[in-house]
Amino acid sequence: MLPGFTMIITSLLLTFFREVEHLLPECLTITNTPQRTLVLIQRFTLLQKVMTIHLLLSIGTLGSLFTLHPQLLKTNLLQKLHKELNSNLDYLISC
């Protein structure tokens, strides 16, 4: 069940990024200033990173539930990813 669920989530995430990348050039022509263009690109890149980290955390959480390994959530890697996700979200909100 988990591999199918993971495939669906990954497919949706990739579709989202393809749509946003398709719209990005149109947004860049609207901004007209190099500084605003750079900020827009940085925010898009950061959004991709945040969404990817969120997906990894979701898979890790679901994986630990289905494989009965609750220690997975306590690993150093997932703690670091969660901390990075929170700091990136704080940055996006402050912009």
Curated annotation (Swiss-Prot):
The chain crosses the membrane at residues 53-69. Residues 1-22 form the signal peptide. GO terms for cellular component: host cell membrane; membrane. Keywords: Host membrane, Membrane, Signal, Transmembrane, Transmembrane helix. Residues 70-95 are cytoplasmic. It is a single-pass type I membrane protein. It is found in: Host membrane. Residues 23-52 are extracellular. This is Uncharacterized protein ORF95.
